[in-house]
């Protein structure tokens, strides 16, 4: 049975459109204690997620230690970041309750704090090699490979290792590229990707609170995306007010940077939509003062109408509380057909609404480098009979082998999706 904390007026309206460029935004429904419901874990029992007709899905790697983000190397090896971070203390009684609720839906496995390498050289879905590439890391999350270096975004620093595809181990110590904001670490994950030409790295850092309730002093350099010059290490902030940019990726037809973002809680089951957006240089996305552009959050004190007036709207709503954690784009024609151009998005799933949202991988079609249509369920079945069998995190597309990998940090599995042969 799901562990639940109910509150008045917590039902969702199925008639509201929660996705796309123009989502319906209902009235604010603030309650003393927000509705909370987590689906308890259950095993797969030999079953797998459900994928569209014409595709197959299989377990590529099992018994991992909290797989998060992944990286497909030029030679096809798959790197898997494993770990758990964060150490923010609870401030309010409802924070304690929320922490208890969330734990019911998480794995009890201790995070590996490592990167695992898996090799399937002949692309038959059965790896020939699995090994720990490097361990003793500090909650690794984002990964990037550029010009002989593997970059790892830990919860407190961006580090790099001298590395060439084909290696199966790293013995040299990490070189620190730059410190990353790590005070409190309410949102500890640090997303990472490289620019198309490899000259720049991008790091996303989440906020230290829901809506600034810890004070704005601890939000310095939080809720941001940084651009880091790979040659000099110099960094600059390119986006602010972007509450929790959990995954970054380059759209391949335009070479522009995109992110999935987790929005704020406790305004009701259908506020605020998590979103997919192009990360625009100099943009302010509203947090904490407003949401979805210039919709003012009445809870934030003091109010800041000047900042609200600067806020821009994101590009594409994904639904409220879906907890989008994974993002990658199809390349080299993707899977072809309906899945040739667009974004794969891993949705970890909700904890603060009575009817669950997320718990799946969706496909957002693109045309001319922009979202072009409603999201399509691509991998489902992570919820069954009110229980969670898995929770998607990172997604990684191999454009050469036409394979999509999905990290599942509840069953500690990486799933492999490919066209049926």
Q: Which stretches of residues belong to each language-model region?
A:
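Surface loop/turn motifs at the tips and blade-to-blade linkers of beta-strand repeat domains
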Residues: 59-64, 131-138, 177-184, 237-241, ...
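Beta-propeller domain segments
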Residues: 9-51, 89-91, 97-106, 110, ...
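Short coil/turn segments that connect the beta-strands within blades of beta-propeller domains
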Residues: 75-76, 147-148, 197-199, 254-255, ...
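Residue position within the beta-strands of beta-propeller blades
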Residues: 79-81, 152-153, 202-204, 258-261, ...
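Asp-box/WD-like beta-propeller blade repeats and closely related beta-sheet repeat scaffolds
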Residues: 126-149, 154-196, 207-210
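Short loop/turn segments immediately following the C-termini of beta-strands
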Residues: 75, 83-85, 155-157, 163, ...
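C-terminal motif of bacterial Sec signal peptides marking the signal peptidase cleavage site
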Residues: 4-7
């Amino acid at each position: 049975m799901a562990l639940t904390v109910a509150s008045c007026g917590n039902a969702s309206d199925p008639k509201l459109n929660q996705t796309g460029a123009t989502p319906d935004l209902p009235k604010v429904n603030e309650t003393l204690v927000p509705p909370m419901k987590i689906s308890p874990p259950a095993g797969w029992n030999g079953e797998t997620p459900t994928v569209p007709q014409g595709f197959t899905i299989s377990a590529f790697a099992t018994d991992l230690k909290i797989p998060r983000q992944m990286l497909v190397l030029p030679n096809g090896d798959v790197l898997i970041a494993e770990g758990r971070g964060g150490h923010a203390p609870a401030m309010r009684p409802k924070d304690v309750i929320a922490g208890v609720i969330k734990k019911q839906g998480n794995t009890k496995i201790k995070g590996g704090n490592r990167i695992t390498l898996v090799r399937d050289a002949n692309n038959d879905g059965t790896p020939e090699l699995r090994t720990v590439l490097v361990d003793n890391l500090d909650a690794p999350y984002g990964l990037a490979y550029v010009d002989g270096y593997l970059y790892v975004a830990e919860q407190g620093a961006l580090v790099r290792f001298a590395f060439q595809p084909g290696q199966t181990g790293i013995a040299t110590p990490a070189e620190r590229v730059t410190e990353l904001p790590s005070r409190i670490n309410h949102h500890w994950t640090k997303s990472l990707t490289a620019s198309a030409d490899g000259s720049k790295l991008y790091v996303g850092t989440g906020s230290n609170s829901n809506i600034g309730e810890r004070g704005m002093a601890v939000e310095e350099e939080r809720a941001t995306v940084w651009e880091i010059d790979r040659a000099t290490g110099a960094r600059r902030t390119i986006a602010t007010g972007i509450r929790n940019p959990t995954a970054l990726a380059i759209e391949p037809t335009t070479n522009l940077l995109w992110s999935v973002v987790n929005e704020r809680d406790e305004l009701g089951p259908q506020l605020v939509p998590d979103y997919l957006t192009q990360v625009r240089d100099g943009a302010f996305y509203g947090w904490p003062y407003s949401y979805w552009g210039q919709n003012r959050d009445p809870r934030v004190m003091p109010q800041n109408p000047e900042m609200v007036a600067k806020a821009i709207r994101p590009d594409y709503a994904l639904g409220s509380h879906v907890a989008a954690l994974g993002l990658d784009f199809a390349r080299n024609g993707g899977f072809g057909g309906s899945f040739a151009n667009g974004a794969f998005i891993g949705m970890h799933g909700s904890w603060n609404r009575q009817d669950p949202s997320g718990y799946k991988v969706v496909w957002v079609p693109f045309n001319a480098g922009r979202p072009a249509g409603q999201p399509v369920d691509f991998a489902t079945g992570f919820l069954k009979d009110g229980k969670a069998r898995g929770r998607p995190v990172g997604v990684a597309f191999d454009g050469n082998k036409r394979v999509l990998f999905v990290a599942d940090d509840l069953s500690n599995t990486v799933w492999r999706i490919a066209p049926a042969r």
